[in-house]
């Protein structure tokens, strides 16, 4: 992956570094956010410091509770098992969300990661990721894919099953617990049979 990408000139001026995907390259579960967090931009690991009511790593705690992240591993180098983390865009502007053009420009990187990882389950984290992944990998119209309605639901798609979540920093404790219970049930099921099904 290109560590010196210059495809989005304005983002090149605001980023600290290009933040590509991170985690287990043989993972079944691929988590996709919208853009790098502030801490991710600093350390180069997607979702670093993301979410939680205290702003201290809500997604990481969720992964730990599911057994997908070693509790003892450092924040800037989490030990992930069966999980891979990435974003729609690789660079951060601290003052705004990415434009549609910037997401389109980064799409080849995301597509390359999806092909490389070949996951069973895609986890869109946040509304933008749900819209982008849902449009690409399901037959559901984009305007029918919304959060919080689709939070912690299982959406069958073309080659992947999607399990959307609200951004961790926006989740209530109840929403977090609901998503964890749904995902734990999925992990205990024969989820690998979802490949190739073409439904909602």
Task: Report each predicted region and the residues it spans.
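A polyanion-binding, active-site-adjacent surface
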Residues: 1-200
């Amino acid at each position: 992956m290109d560590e010196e990408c210059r495809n989005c000139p304005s983002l090149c001026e605001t980023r600290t570094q290009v933040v590509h995907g991170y985690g287990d390259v043989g993972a079944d579960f691929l988590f996709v956010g919208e853009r790098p967090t502030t801490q991710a931009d600093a350390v180069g690991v997607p979702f670093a410091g993301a979410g939680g009511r205290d702003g201290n790593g809500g997604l990481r705690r969720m992964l730990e509770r599911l057994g997908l992240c070693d509790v003892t591993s450092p924040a800037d180098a989490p030990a992930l098992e069966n999980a891979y983390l990435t974003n729609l865009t690789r660079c951060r502007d601290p003052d705004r969300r990415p434009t549609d053009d910037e997401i389109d420009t980064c799409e080849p990187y995301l597509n390359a990661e999806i092909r490389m990882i070949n996951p069973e389950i895609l986890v869109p984290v946040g509304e933008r990721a749900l819209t982008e992944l849902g449009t690409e990998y399901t037959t559901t119209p984009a305007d029918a894919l919304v959060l919080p309605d689709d939070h912690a639901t299982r959406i069958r798609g073309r080659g992947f099953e999607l399990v959307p979540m609200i951004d961790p920093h926006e989740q209530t404790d109840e929403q977090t617990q609901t998503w964890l219970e749904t995902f734990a049930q999925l992990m205990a099921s024969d989820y690998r049979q979802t490949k190739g099904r073409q439904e909602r």
